[in-house]
Each structure stands twice: as structure tokens, then as C-alpha cells.
Amino acid sequence: MRRMKALTAAMTAALLVSGCSTLPSNTDPQVLRSFNADDQSAEVAGPTPGADPDILLRGFFSAAAFPAQQYQASRAYLTEEANRNWDPTATTVVVDRIDLNTQAGATEDERRIVIRGTQVGTLGSGGVYRPENSELVAEIVMRRVDNEWRIDDLPDGVVLERTEMRNHYTPKNVYFFDPSGQVLVGDRRWIHNAVQSLDTTLMSLLVSGPSQYLAPGVVHQLPSGASFVGFSDGAYQFTGLSSMNEEERLSFATQVVWMLAHAEIPGPYAIFADGSPLVADFPVLSIEDVAEFNPEAYTNAVSTLFSLRDGVVSRVSSGTVTPLTGFLGSGDIDSVAISTSANVAAAVRGNESPRLSVGAPEGSYTDVLTADTITRPTFEYAANALWAVADGDTPVRVTRSSTTRELVQTEVEITLPEGVTGAISEFQLSRTGVRAAMIIEGRVYMGVVTRPSPGERGVTNIVEVAPALRETALSLAWRQDGSLLVGTSMPELPIWRVEIDGSGASALPSGNINAPVVSVASSASTIYATDAHALLQLPASDNTIWREVPGLLGVRSAAVVAY
């Protein structure tokens, strides 16, 4: 296996993610059966004899969570004419809840019922979830047939309550490399629990390429004629890969291995292309062969905790707080990002005339940017570059010139959704550097980082991911599992977790924490939040009580988690 190790070593780079902190001054749904056309959903009870129209209609919406055989379970609730005309593949709308209201003018044989709900998302082809925020209103005609109520007229498409989606679909990651080839990026897909061959379903999704949302930020190196032909002779079989070189084959094998492993499909894995092992001389691969690219290695990484108080950054360890020397101990730090692995820090200094400075955590610094306002800095993967937003609307990327070795800055083009205006108050890159999260006028958005040309960056496909928070968001941080931690000004529910695809936002325990939550951070084992009174911590495992951080009791400071 020595040769395999050499190949992976040539592709990888050191894992490095920074910690940061500040104190304020229309697609079709699928069961995703792929190669198993006979997959069946669980047994679904049909219409209850004698059911009233509203009860029958709710049964229809519950049955919509089972799309097998062209929504056969749902069709049992339709009249013959409605069954012929209904196209369930038009779109799958996900709503928070479905409310029913019978319209005036009902007769013994006909009822018109209006359905209403807040549309929170759509579930598209390939199991891709896209967040939405709009009102759904539609009319459904019920008719009595043979003394039983049935649906006689309804809009095309499917409406799912969010709880039904979560009960019957499970999110899995399909992995693609970032443009540098250094890190795997998860592309979240919702796959129906009734699928009988999860591995072949995932393979088909992998070959099909990244979702339209994520595609601008990742690479897909498979030839256009590539296809997955199934699992046979104990191996996953692909065709159309003959033009791929050895490095491309290893990259694809790495995607396959980690996709299957994190879907809890046990290895080792035999992967063949055009009748031969995908990677020459290694017909069977395990996660140990490509361990350098484990996309979840970060979840168990050892971190260092720092605090920011009164402009001074301190190291926090075993209840002891030690102020740093160098520029981070100068007393004028407003916000900071630290990478202990790369021995680099970036800080916004000065309140009246903010400057972005870069240097060793306990050394000297270089000023790289001045502006009226500068957001908390954030590092790309492996600390290859630094980002911050100047004056509320201009993302700036700072990197070291390969020719002069000087620090240079370039503006990043950012494409906001139509109608979205206001200052960007928070901006943070994900661990992979492929996603960006931001707060604009108290609302949380997420976008994809693009590379139009070498040295050039952009942020596109920006969507709001937590509309339930309204305009209350104040702070955010990426968690190790890829979700977002969001601090808010909401008195009852001050801190939230937001899923990476916007499919959900859930409040974290609020015991002993008081809004506003002006700073948040997260390590593999602990969540940190600065509320109205102090810096608090909560174990990432089940717990409901926030406690003060030893060494910082009664102190209102911000946590900085660094790797």
C-alpha cells in the first residue's frame, strides 16, 4: 500500500481551520431508486372508509411522503379523472404545516377546500433541498364517488409537511473536491428511507455530478460519457472512465470511499472501471488508504481556546487565562481569527479607524486594510488567504503574492439575491472554504465561493437559510458538522442551529442564557456564547444548562476557537 500512500500524500495539504471572534462595539421529487425499479415504500394505509373530506385530504398529504411507483399511495385518494390528470413530478413543495379551510357553497357531493401553509423549501431532483420563504395557497375540489369522498381536482406537484419529509427522508452527503483538490466538500441529498440499495443510489448521484447550487464551487472530473452500471462480482462497476489519468482516478476513488463510509456502508470497497480496478494494482480500497481526505476529521480535531476581552486576546487553559504578547495583547483588538496550525492571526484593530492586521499570534503585524467598518476576519482552508468585508458591502480577500511575497488584497464579487440590501455585519467561510455564511440586516444567508480565474474569487447562489429568525441574528459560526451556530436577540430562544442546506433551524437549550447573544463559537466538544452578562459554554453532547467558562467567571468576553 506504499504507492497508494505516496499518491494521497501528493494530493493532500495540511488540515487547518481558523477560529474567530468579536465583541460588538422547479424540479421533480424522486425516491432515488436508481437501479432497483422494484423498490417499494413501506405499506401505506389507503383512504379510511367513510372519512370526511378534511380527514381524507390529510391522509392524501401524508401518503405524498411515499413516492414509489409514481405516487401510487397518493393516487388511491383521487377520482379516476384526477388520477389521469395529476402530475406529481412538477414540483415537491415543503411547508411548515398544512391548514385546511372549507369554502362556502358546499353541497352534499362537492366541497372546495383551500390549503395554506408557509413554504419553507423545495425538494428537487437528486434529493436536493432548497430553502424558500413564501406563502402557499391552493384550492382542491373534493367529490363524493360511490358514497366516498375523493379528490377530483388538484394542482400538479406534491406538498409535504416538513415533519413528513424528516420522518421519511434521510440526508446523506455526496462528496466532491474543491478546485484545489485538497478537501472534500459535502453535497447534501435527502434520500427516501424506503430505498433498498442506498449504495447504488449514492453512486448514481455521484456520477450525475454536484447539485446546481454547489456546482460553481467544486469540481467534477468524470468524462461526459461516464456511468455507473451497478454492483456485480463484488465490485462497484463504472464505464466510460478510460480517459482519466491516475491522479483523477485516485480522486474519484477517494470520493467513492468517503461517500460510502459516511453513509455507514461498510468497506473495504472494490471499485472497477471499464472492467479493471479503478486505481491500478489496488482493486480494493478502505478509508485507511485515503485517510488524509476524511471530510469529518475536523470533528475530532484538538482545538485551542482563546478569549477576547477589553481589546486583549488571552489563551484559556484549565481555568487559567494568560494574555498573549505581541500585537494581540495590545489592547486595541476588536475582532480576531487565529490559526494555531499555521501560526497566523488576523485582527481588526481600533474602533475609530479600523485596520485589518495580519501577523504571528504573539509577534509583529502588518496592516493590510483600512475602512470605516471591517467584519470579523475569516480564513480560507489551510489559511491560504484571509477574508473580511469592508464598509458593509465589499468582501476583500488578502493573500501573499507568489512573486513578490507581499500581502495583496483583491475585492470579491458578491451576487446578492434580488431585493436584498443592507450592510453585511458578519461574514464567515466554512472549513472547506467553499461556502460562506453572512448576516445582512439581521437575516442569515449562505452562498458558494467561486473561482472565475486564478487568484479571483466570487460568492454566488446566496440564499436565506433561516427565515424563522427574521431580523434577529447577531452572530454566527460554523460548527464542525457543517451546520451554523447563530446567536440572536430573541429573548426566549437566543441561540440556534441552522442546517447546511437550510432544511431546518432549531433552537438550542436556553437555560441560563440571556439575549442578546453577541458572539458564538464552537469546538468539537463545546459550544460557546457571549450573552448579555458573560461568556458561557455548553457541551456539544446532550445538556440543557449553559455554564460560565472556568477562569472567566463573571467576565463578558468572546470565545475564539482555533485549530
From Swiss-Prot:
Gene Ontology annotations for the cellular component aspect, listed alphabetically: plasma membrane
Cited Pfam families: Gmad1
Lipid-modified residues, S-diacylglycerol cysteine kind: 20
InterPro entries recorded: GerMN, Lipoprotein_LpqB, Lipoprotein_LpqB_C
Signal peptide: 1-19
Membrane topology of the entry: Lipid-anchor
Annotated localization: Cell membrane
Chief place of localization: membrane
Transmembrane annotation, as ranges: none
Database matches in NCBIfam families: PRK13616.1
Name of the protein this chain belongs to: Lipoprotein LpqB
Organism the protein comes from: Corynebacterium efficiens (strain DSM 44549 / YS-314 / AJ 12310 / JCM 11189 / NBRC 100395)
